[in-house]
Each structure stands twice: as C-alpha cells, then as structure tokens.
Amino acid sequence: MQRLRMYVMRADVTLEDVSDNFVRIGISGEQMVEELGKVMNAVPAEDDQVMHSGDITVLRVPGVQPRFEAYISAHEAARKLWDTLNVRGAPVGESAWRLLEILAGLPTVFAATSELFVPQMANLQLVNGVSFKKGCYPGQEIVARMQYLGTLKRRMYLGRIATDEPAFPGGELFTEADSEQVVGRLVDAQPHPDGGQAALAVIQITAAEASDLHLGSSEGAAFTLGTLPYPFES
C-alpha cells in the first residue's frame, strides 16, 4: 500500500486497504448463473461486465464455462449468497479456481514471478488486461515501447506437464537440445483431472515452436503445448 501511494497524483485521492471488509467468492458452472439470479437483480452476461445488488458486487470473468467473482461487504449478504450457491454447488478450494484460471489463459502473478515478465509476455494485451491509451504505472514506457516498436520474443502458452508431482510458479523450462539454457518459466500449474499438471508458461517463441520442452532440466517431465482459448495477435 505504501508503494501504491507513491503514484497518487491528486490531493483528494486516498488509498486504504479494505481487504478485511470484503468476502470474495469464486463461482463457476452453468447452473450457477441461475443460482446467482436468486440473490442478484441481474447477472453479468458478458466477460468483464460488473453488476451490483445491495452489498454484493459480481464480476463475470472469462472461462470455459460461466465464471464469476463475487465481492460481498456485509456478513449476512455473504452468508445468504453462500447458502444459495451451496444447494447446487459445492466448495472446491483454491486449487480448482487456479486451474480454471489456467485453462482460461489468465495469468496470476506470484512473488516468485513478480519481476520476470512484462505484460505482453503474459498475454495481458490479449485479454483486456492492459491499456495502451491511458494510465500511469511503473514501467509504462517500456510496455508501450514493446507494443509499438519492439518485437515480442516470449509469450505465454497453455500446456500440460507429464507428471503428478507439484510444479510451482517460476519453474524453469529447458529444451532437449540445450541443457544449460532456460527457455521458459511457469506462470502457474495445477493438477488436471485427466492427469498431469495443467500449466501456463512464458516461453521463448522459437523454443515453443521446437516443441521439445521439459520442466526442471532437459531430461525432466515433458511440457506439451495446448491451445489457448484466444488467438495470438497476428
């Protein structure tokens, strides 16, 4: 919060940490649209659309099935929403939500990866995650230069790691041809119901095209590229 306050340019703006004032619930599933409608005046129909109803704010987020994030500012409203969703839904935990984020091609930044990527490497320009028309933030000039003048050499890919062993953000990827050169880093990885780990990774484009990627070493678990739910820029 102290670092964020450095970028407040107007005297009448204040920043305050209100994390403890809200409950956040991730919601996913075809049936959940109907269940949300029982406590909301209207349910967001488009990705990135936001709806408010009393003490509940709901944001629709991209996904292979309907997904929402609910932010609730009152205890009773949170309890009512939870009890409503719990009839046809079930709590599944953070790992399941992170898997859905991975399958949607949405990057999450962790401490281990906070200084590794510029936004374009993590595909943020493809998912409405960064604006080149407005805003002021650290590194803005570098980001804009990459967008308008630079050549992107790394980008984020969806893939599957052929191991049930946990994989972690920042994990290194290698090719069989070069055991010394790190060609990619994991953004996140979570167990997939069909086995192995679903993962997002920022990888050198030339290395990704070679398709002989491995986690941890050139002889580690194979990393097989999948298909993101959105196209790369042409």
Identify the role of each PLM range.
Residues 1-104:
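Acidic, low-complexity central loop/insert segments
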Residues 79-80, 102, 109-113, 152-156:
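Short acidic/glycine-rich loop or secondary-structure boundary segments that cap or lie
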Residues 106-108, 192:
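Active-site/binding-pocket entry motifs
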Residues 108, 112-124:
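Active-site loop ensemble at the mouth of alpha/beta enzyme cores that anchors a bound cofactor
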Residues 122-130, 144-234:
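Glycine-rich, small/acidic residue-mixed loop/short-helix segments
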Residues 140-141:
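Structural motif
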